[in-house]
């Protein structure tokens, strides 16, 4: 629950009775191990006098060989059964969305037996020369500068984004890619980002659990390789004031075992109705649980970045583009109840059937939206660069799964009352569109007008993390996690305590570092300079 990787190395060394040793290995060594659970963040679940915890192999994530060590991805639970990691709730959420989405897919294709959540992350970071980095106590201790002066040339010329990559940086990037490919991380894209010294990597999209693991491993690789090139990789969300910070866009979609992306429009009205079903239900989930999405991206570092004209605001909204908005507006105008055959045909041909044409030419990109539809996926843009993707993916898959369950129950009730399947789907979708309309926003998320409009719409604007963490322990959140079997009340409250404690400890470290720098670096130099000025004044007086 530190948000980073943890590892324990066990050798295959086994002494023998005759004083020699052999290498001994069997599968039982991989399945379960017993580390100390009290030494990790645990939110009070484990104490020093009751410290037992267990690791268990996660066979759904790839094992890999790092140097000469076989690495087994594992979950981590307390002796009493509570999850003490980020992987366990993620796996539970992925299982829930699999079942819920598969059930809804039965309305359209009975060959669908499994639905996978996909994730493609975009990792932003800064590279700083090691000597310059180590000369700054604040960078060493906190990962960001606490004092400093803006350079004459920052990012005002807009010439760094996609610019020529410096040779030394490129050599570091190539080795990071090489080491990543050796471990099965399919890194595909590299480029300069907006701020000087800022760069980005992005891989091929993959199954969410595997992709989350790969990102955690990738951040570790970046740090190690950067050091070999006399760089330091900065993953803090805002390492330097006055220029852009770093984020980690999470591109999310759902795909079936038959190879269909459920968030990609099809070539027929039937396939487009399936697309609309998952598209609209995702927006409804974001509307109903926007506060939890805000909590999922909260951190001390991300507080410096959200809403600062470089990242999405702290108000959770969804951008879908003007053309898809018009499609939803048409569906909203439907009369309730059964539709005539003529009306249904017109709807399928003139509204639902034209979606591929609309998306081909009219899907724009709104960089100010925290949750944007980009043609065949949703892009969750507010995740911090140093964060694990597990938090955001757990919440997103959980809320979508819960909404799909509600939607299916509503449709089944309408069908049981004698309504045809298509009529029931359209009626249920209309209800979702109306209920979630306020969370859709097409304008400038950086503007003050949006803050005023969001307040009128009843959307929360929570600019700081401590208050955002409170959304985890509301009665509604507790019920959501419990009824879907993702986290029980004890596990949820433990995470809340850990997040709050981590936030305050980071602020405390920054405060102490700032105090040390002022007392031992800034003030002595200022006094020395003051003394020099005084001496100069006295000498000038003597000359006069």
Q: Language-model segments: which ranges?
A:
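Glycine-rich, acidic/polar active-site loops that bind/position phosphate-bearing ligands
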Residues: 1-235, 244-250, 254-497
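Short, well-ordered turn and helix-capping elements at secondary-structure junctions
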Residues: 237-239
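Substrate-recognition/cap regions that form aromatic- and gly/pro-loop-enriched pockets
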Residues: 500-544
